[in-house]
Amino acid sequence: MSETSSNAIPAYLPLRNDLIGEEPYGAPQLDVPVCLNVNENPYAPEPAVVETIAQRVKEIAPTLNRYPDREHIELRKAFSTYLERESGVKLSVDQLWGANGSNEIMLQLFQAFGGPGRIALGCDPTYSMYPEYARDTFTTWKLAHRNADFTLDVDATIKAIEDVKPAMIVLTSPNNPTGTPLKPEDLKRVLEAARTAEVAGAAEGVHPVVVVDEAYIEFRDPGTPTALELIGEYENLAVSRTMSKAFAFAGARVGYLAANKGIIDCVRIVRMPYHLSAVTQAAALAAFEHTDEQLSRVAHLRETRNATSAWLKEQTYKGQPLEVAETQSNFILFGGHFDDRDRIFDELLKRGVLIRVVGPEGWMRVCMGTDEEMARFREALVEVLRIVEQG
């Protein structure tokens, strides 16, 4: 993997005025020995999984002259089976929808519920793509701020709902980039507020949709609830999931949405025709045949996260212990008082370790790798912090 040069848009092209000077989103993709910056599952699919995927794709290859099932019914059935097993929540095909990664799911939600004159509300710090979805759909993006420990400030969020009258409220659990879980009681308070809240520019009786992005939810501690459990109780709740993280399927680009049928039907209006290729559907169905294997490393990654959090808390920078955000994801936000995080990033990169400069000033994020990768990260970080301290 390598980085391409930055955008150089010719002046004669009629690029939208609001896009002039913008750069494409993307974390660095570099050829380094230890890549810990994009929150992937570091373990490749088992040979049996690879074999099944290859066989299922081979089986559908003779049909590639025809369009795929645009409603991807079999895949939606597989989502249902998986979620009942993983979360104990039974959902019908009508309550599920798939797309090319949860990025496309989120974009479809913004297309359906955002637009000119509409507002979407998030809670800062949060995933950096949300404002880009808003920009791309001409939706106004507003923020409520989190507490100092990155938990949701429910009172501030509810006040923002009342003040800005959003069509969408976007929450993330575990939150990216902090890893902070969303407490069920906090989510319920937001859902209750949204039930009666007004939407700017909409007719009376229209209320906002609450979207919970659960891209990293499989890494939560055992027994921690999921927002899926509330779908039957709240008709205004939509939950986004992905196969990219815990399920070790990032290269296939498969995300999915769980919600009541009304929300799914709204998304179906804006989806592109035949948006999920036959190859994608076949590969995803094959992966679900091996759910145990695909999730086999999650418990170990959770243990690695907990051990790494404890280790980071023992480290110091300029005489102060590192701050470490509470996390139930496969990544950790740490630092808190780094006064030159860009140099720390560069020095780590020189040693073959790639992490992420993201989140509030003074913080950095590292995702969990293999045991060997994490050992190299620890060794490099200790060395780099001492070097940067010396100026």
From Swiss-Prot:
Family matches, as Pfam families: Aminotran_1_2
Pathway listed: Amino-acid biosynthesis; L-histidine biosynthesis; L-histidine from 5-phospho-alpha-D-ribose 1-diphosphate: step 7/9
Listed cofactors: pyridoxal 5'-phosphate
SUPFAM superfamilies (alphabetical): PLP-dependent transferases
Keyword Amino-acid biosynthesis: yes
Sample GO molecular function, one term: histidinol-phosphate transaminase activity
Claim: Oxidoreductase is one of the keywords in the record: no
Domain of life: Bacteria
Family statement drawn from the similarity comment of this UniProt entry: Belongs to the class-II pyridoxal-phosphate-dependent aminotransferase family. Histidinol-phosphate aminotransferase subfamily.
Description of how the protein assembles with itself and partners: Homodimer.
Name this protein carries in UniProt: Histidinol-phosphate aminotransferase
Organism: Bifidobacterium adolescentis (strain ATCC 15703 / DSM 20083 / NCTC 11814 / E194a)
Lineage per the UniProt record: Bacteria, Bacillati, Actinomycetota, Actinomycetes, Bifidobacteriales
Gene expressing this chain: hisC
